[in-house]
Swiss-Prot record:
Cofactor note: Binds 1 [4Fe-4S] cluster per subunit.
Gene behind this protein: cysH
E.C. code: 1.8.4.10
Official protein name in the record: Adenosine 5'-phosphosulfate reductase
InterPro entries membership: APS_reductase (IPR011798), PAPS/APS_Rdtase (IPR004511), PAPS_reduct_dom (IPR002500), Rossmann-like_a/b/a_fold (IPR014729)
Lineage of producing organism: Bacteria, Pseudomonadati, Pseudomonadota, Alphaproteobacteria, Hyphomicrobiales
Cofactor: [4Fe-4S] cluster
A single MF term (Gene Ontology): 4 iron, 4 sulfur cluster binding
């Protein structure tokens, strides 16, 4: 694994140039090289895992190479049991801690009072509000003090993600987002998992290529896009939880969150 001898300082003033340079550098590296390079730039690096097959590949690389990258997950309170069980299995397998960030019960109660516990089925606004409470607020806490946010986004996951770069500046959170697997397709992912014997969510074998909260995820049909089972009752262009959508952090839908 050959890592370029490059020192970079990422700052908001030169964000576009810094990010473009970093994107070009990462394009020439393999997965372990990309993660090692980012870990060596200085500043806290955080990887958010949903325990999906892509994220398991990144977690395996972090654990195998003992990289100084914090691994965190958003335990929304509505995950599949298989996903929750995989957290412990993954920690044990790779000797790492996956730190869990959970929503506040007061926020959940306020959401339920406004929309109903399962109100996300009734409107896009209600679904976005649920994701805001269960994902976006915990994500903000997970990324506090981070300079780099590593994700498992891939270009092949959906049309919305077809232009995913290796590095992009997140102005709302004032950090650099690193999409370390942007150019991997699902066949590369599966081959790597098989070669390295990486534990994966058993739901993948039951027709769930993309796994989120249990009430909002279904198995897909043959020929459907990988993320077709996420919020399947909505139009494709709206099928994002807000974690990777510009503007979602600062301008959420009508809030169900109480003022404190």
């Amino acid at each position: 694994m050959e890592i370029p001898d490059v020192t970079m300082t990422i700052n908001s003033t030169n964000a576009s140039a810094d990010t473009a340079s970093l994107d070009a550098t990462l394009a020439g590296l393999d997965l372990a090289g990309r993660l090692s390079f980012v870990a060596g730039l200085g500043g806290r690096a955080v990887f958010t895992t949903s325990l999906g097959i892509e994220d398991q590949v990144i977690t395996a690389a972090i654990g195998t190479h003992r990289l100084p990258i914090d691994v965190v997950t958003l335990e929304t309170g509505r995950l599949f049991k298989e996903t929750v069980d995989l957290i412990d299995e993954t920690e044990e397998r790779f000797g790492i801690e996956i730190r869990r960030f959970r929503p506040e019960q007061d926020d959940i109660d306020a959401y339920a009072a406004k929309y109903g516990l399962n109100g996300f089925y009734e409107s896009v606004e209600a679904r976005h509000a649920c994701c805001h409470v269960r994902k976006l607020i915990p994500l903000g806490k997970a990324l506090e003090g981070a300079a780099f946010w590593i994700t498992g986004l891939r270009r092949g996951q959906s049309g919305n993600r077809a232009a995913t770069p290796f590095a992009e500046f997140d102005a709302e959170r004032n950090l650099i987002k690193i999409n370390a697997l942007a150019d991997w397709d699902i066949e590369q992912i599966r081959a790597y998992v098989a070669e390295e014997n990486i534990p994966v969510n058993p739901l993948h074998q039951r027709g769930y290529p993309s796994i989120g909260c249990e009430p909002c995820t279904r198995a897909i049909k043959p020929g459907e896009p990988e993320r077709a089972g996420r919020w399947w009752w909505e139009n494709d262009e709206k099928r994002e939880c807000g974690l990777h959508v510009a503007g979602a952090e600062q301008t959420p839908p009508v809030s169900a969150i109480p003022q404190r």
